């Protein structure tokens, strides 16, 4: 009976092979003394690989309070799909939601379509880049704006020490067509070291840069985090 009940699952896996990998990086800082600081940083990633395609979703949440006053409150959610039509070339679809209300970015929704190139993909390293056209819907300081844009993305991983250590860099650059809006760059750079099969230490730098930010906001927002990562 148990063998028969397992047969449908085996057939499903054969028809629709799944290679799903997810991880969650967490960093929490609390300090007190002359001032009290609370910082929470969470990065979640999930990647599903198929025969000719790949789905990837990411979620970043970053908050900071100093003396009970919120000094950072950022949300960044992305989804991307790759459809390979050759061993190295692929079509790409991407969507991103970004919010940083303390910089008067009430929301930024980006929809992109384009093409990408897998520069290399080996057991020790991988690099891909893509270029596409985007539609950017923004609400800045309560004002709604809509603009076309050009998007350039990079995704790089390098493994060391029999894949126990990983260096990575991810970048998305938006060149927004609206006059005076300029470019928006988001990136994550970091190192991970495996402490066990499921847990690793994670050091990461997250950058948000705007050439022409809303009035009163800084161009650069750079966050460093040191925490633990869980793979599942």
Spans of model-derived segments:
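Outer-membrane beta-barrel "beta-signal"
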Residues: 112, 220-232
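Transmembrane beta-barrel strands of outer-membrane/channel proteins
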Residues: 26-28, 57-63, 77-81, 93-97, ...
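Solvent-exposed loop/turn segments connecting transmembrane beta-strands
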Residues: 30-38, 66-72, 100-107, 140-146, ...
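Repeated loop/turn-to-beta-strand initiation elements of outer-membrane beta-barrel proteins
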Residues: 51-57, 88-91, 123-127, 159-167, ...
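Transmembrane beta-strands of outer-membrane beta-barrel pores
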Residues: 28-32, 50, 61-65, 97-101, ...
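Outer-membrane beta-barrel architecture
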Residues: 25-27, 43-45, 80, 114-119, ...
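Detector for outer-membrane/organellar transmembrane beta-barrel domains
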Residues: 124-175
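Compositionally biased alpha-helical segments
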Residues: 1-27, 31, 36, 41-45
């Amino acid at each position: 009976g148990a063998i028969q009940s397992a047969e449908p699952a085996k057939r499903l896996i054969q028809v629709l092979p799944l290679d799903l990998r997810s991880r969650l990086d967490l960093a929490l800082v609390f300090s007190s003394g002359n001032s009290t600081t609370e910082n929470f940083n969470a990065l979640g990633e999930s990647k599903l690989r198929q025969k000719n395609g790949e789905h990837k979703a990411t979620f970043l949440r970053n908050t900071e309070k100093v003396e009970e006053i919120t000094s950072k409150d950022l949300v960044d959610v992305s989804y991307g799909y790759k459809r390979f039509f050759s061993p190295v070339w692929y079509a790409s679809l991407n969507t991103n939601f970004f919010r940083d209300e303390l910089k008067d970015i009430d929301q930024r929704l980006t929809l992109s379509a384009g093409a990408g190139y897998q520069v290399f993909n080996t057991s020790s390293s991988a690099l891909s880049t893509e270029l596409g056209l985007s539609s950017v819907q923004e609400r800045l300081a309560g004002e709604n704006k809509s603009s076309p844009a050009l998007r350039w993305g990079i995704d790089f991983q390098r493994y060391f020490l029999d894949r126990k250590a990983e260096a990575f860099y991810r970048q998305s650059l938006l060149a927004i067509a609206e006059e005076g809006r300029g470019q928006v760059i988001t990136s994550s750079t970091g190192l991970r070291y495996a402490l066990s099969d499921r847990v690793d230490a994670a050091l990461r730098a997250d950058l948000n840069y705007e050439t022409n930010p809303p009035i009163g906001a800084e161009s650069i927002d750079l966050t460093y985090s040191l925490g633990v990562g869980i793979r599942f």
